[in-house]
Regions:
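Long, contiguous binding/interaction regions
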Residues: 2-89
């Protein structure tokens, strides 16, 4: 079940933004390989949850986008995973 925009805004970690039907955060790193290690770590979390984010890797940044395509928007699992990714960071 998707969450309303108000529910998402009320519960979204301050480090994340809502963009339409997705939540997004860009993580910044001192170097490329540290960002790659972070991607590996969050990929393991995503695989365990069987909920896979869209990840864009830059030179010293990693952008993560979460949504539930099957449900058609942002769900509880997206918010939970955002918090888990922040903990990993």
């Amino acid at each position: 079940m998707t969450l309303s925009a108000e529910e998402v805004d009320d519960r979204l970690p301050a480090t994340w933004d809502r963009e339409g039907d997705e939540i997004v955060r860009t993580y910044e790193f001192d170097d490329y390989l540290t960002g790659i290690e972070f991607v590996r770590d969050i990929a393991e979390i995503a695989d365990e949850e069987f909920h896979h984010p869209e990840i864009t890797i830059g030179f010293r940044s990693v952008e993560v986008r979460l949504t539930n395509h099957e449900a058609g928007g942002i769900t509880e699992i997206d918010l939970d995973m955002a918090a888990q990714f922040d903990d990993e960071f």
